[in-house]
Amino acid sequence: MRSTLACIAVFVGLCPSITSSQDANDRAHHIQNNVLGIDGHNDTVQRVVYENVDLGNRLSDGMIDIPRLHAGGVHVPFFALWVPTYYKGSEAVRRTLDLRDAMQRVLDKHPDQIELATSARDIERIVGQSKIAAVLTVEGGHQIANDLAVLRMYRRMGILSMTLTHFRSNDWADSSTGKPEHNGLTDFGKQVVHEMNSIGMIVDISHVSDKTFYDVLQVTSKPVIASHSSCRSMSDVPRNMTDDMLRALARNGGVVGVNFAASFLNQQDAEELKRKVSNENALEPNLAGTELDQFAAKEYFEDKGEFKVGHATVEDAAKCIDHIVKIAGIEHVGIGSDFDGITLVPHDLEDVSKIPNLTVALLNRGYSEDDIKKIMGENFLRVIREVVGN
């Protein structure tokens, strides 16, 4: 009898924490269902191209599909049209068009589930219809082939943002992970920024070198974003932002989307970024057309085979958000998962359906529902409205 009573006492003692945990989960799902959730960066279009997946179905692997976007409360994913930096000139443009076509096939196949958004008003209308509002971006300035006409063409195709560099420096801007060639932004690079401001295209400074970042802020007349970067104070990798950079971005009115790559969130995982960078930057295939695409496909599947869970956890992502809020302010942080572009993910944040786990972590840190709405989407929406327009 005494042992039975003792067990009952232990169970009763546990009940408040069990109930509290369930309450937090329920509240998190409620918030995610009612927030206008924006994820500032994913690489899911690669899966459409290389694996011919149907994003309308819940997939058995990968990190994003339409059902899991709804489950995670992410209604506005930024789909990156990313072309590896070993594609040069017209080949990079051709491949960008291939990716744009692949995304169009998704939109055409599921018009009742997903629609292209090209303005803030589009986003609000589409989400109001319980559909996914797809925002398209270009991830790498090499994809304009040093031609402002190509940049303008991308904008007319509904692309709202461009990352100025990727892993390598290009002809007009230095990358954070490439050999510095220009001491930041060249005169043509400054023209690119001016043109993006003029045509209503968001400047994305993820991937750029520190010097390029500060050069951009000297040139731009509009807020910029770091679509998928995190805190260098947590993981000392060049892709992350220093506290001074965070303050400067806040003064600009911009937003940093916290990257969920484990290597960006926990120093123990930092070697993974070095692996990815060294692998791509070492590649110089002397190929073109179909042969180059086949080479890229081989690299894609080899990289996908490296997928695993790292030392980082969802708590590290919350800690990074917390740090940015303290340094830059609540108005200047969002999420930029990099899902389907990362191979080392945090515990409890393995795909987009797990975003409510991050909401729970933020609630446990004392963030209000209004705070979380800003972090989960309103801050990015503000920049879209200010740069792209209604």
Predicted regions and their residues:
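Positively charged n-region of N-terminal signal peptides that target proteins for export
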Residues: 1-4
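Substrate-binding cleft of carbohydrate-active enzyme catalytic domains
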Residues: 194-205, 209-215, 243-251
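Short, contiguous, pocket-lining structural segments
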Residues: 181-188, 204-209, 241
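Bacterial N-terminal signal peptides
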Residues: 6-16
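Distinct, well-ordered alpha-helical segments
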Residues: 51, 147-151, 212-222
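His/Asp/Glu-rich metal/cofactor-coordinating catalytic motifs and the adjacent surface-exposed loops
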Residues: 218-228, 232-234, 239-240
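Alpha-helix-loop-beta-strand connector modules within alpha/beta enzyme cores
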Residues: 182-198, 216-226, 358-361
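N-terminal hydrophobic targeting/anchoring segments and the immediately downstream early-domain regions
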Residues: 18-183, 232, 236-390
